[in-house]
Design a protein with these regions (language model features):
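Non-heme di-metal
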Residues: 2-3, 9-244
Length: 244
């Protein structure tokens, strides 16, 4: 295993508030994600099927959350000389407890929506999910566990709108029980993002570490947007051919 984290590059902390810098970068990139999200939740024919596909894909994303954080915490333990490692590990251990079981919420929602939870859990995850999650495994293992903070910043900084669960319930006719995860994350994720901002501003991040967090975050925006575009397009009818 190659450690190219704190051993490579300047050892002084980067100037300026890290959380504000990351938010500024994401503000430039996130319109792409917002457009993909709007496309996914567009009203009309196919919304129920799109929502069910979303539950399945997000199950495969979210079930990786705790293992990713556990791996990152383990890597922190191997970086005892790195001043970022110990506070990062404390944050991860706390966050692991908060995130555990969220994949089960998605399976419960899928069952309420009439889908087969066992089938979802046994499905091969889409390649777009592997692209989203797999990059984090690589960066944690072969670069530095702090990169995971960019991933977390995007997932928790783009929580469902508080009104989304109600709108989807009305337009799909599915029971309220099918929207538990959307509703809970609308309530929880804003506070989690604030916690992450405080951590980013406390950590003595080097310039290269701040860059790594930003690269991870921007990749996550792109990968989630691509996943949502695929979910929105799956099963869509092709446009009718023009008549000449």
């Amino acid at each position: 295993m190659t450690d190219t984290g704190t051993g490579a590059g300047p050892g002084t902390a980067a100037p300026g508030p890290a959380s504000a810098a990351l938010r500024a970068k994401l503000a430039l990139a996130e319109p792409v994600l917002h457009r993909a999200t709007a496309r996914l939740w567009r009203p009309g024919a196919g919304l129920t099927a799109r929502y069910t596909r979303y539950l399945g894909a997000m199950y495969h994303v979210i079930r990786a959350s705790v293992p990713l954080m556990e791996l990152a915490a383990l890597r922190c333990a191997a970086l005892a000389a790195d001043p970022v490692a110990a506070p990062l590990a404390r944050y991860l251990h706390h966050h692991i407890d908060e995130e555990r079981g969220h994949d089960d919420w998605l399976l419960a929602d899928a069952a309420a929506a009439g889908a087969d939870p066992g089938g979802i859990a046994g499905d091969t995850p889409p390649a777009a999910v592997a692209r989203l999650v797999g990059a984090q495994y690589y960066w944690i293992e072969y670069h530095h566990p702090v990169t995971l903070l960019g991933y977390i910043a995007v997932l928790e900084g783009n929580a469902p709108a508080p009104w989304l669960a109600g709108r989807l319930a009305r337009e799909t006719g599915l029971p309220d029980a099918a929207f538990g995860t959307v509703r809970r994350h609308a309530d929880l994720d804003g506070g989690h993002r604030d916690d992450l901002d405080r951590l980013l501003d406390r950590l003595p991040l080097t310039v290269r570490q701040r860059t790594a967090v930003a690269v991870s975050a921007l990749h996550t925006v792109d990968a989630v947007a691509e996943l949502f575009r695929q979910l929105a397009a799956a099963g869509a009818r092709p446009a009718p051919a023009a008549i000449h």
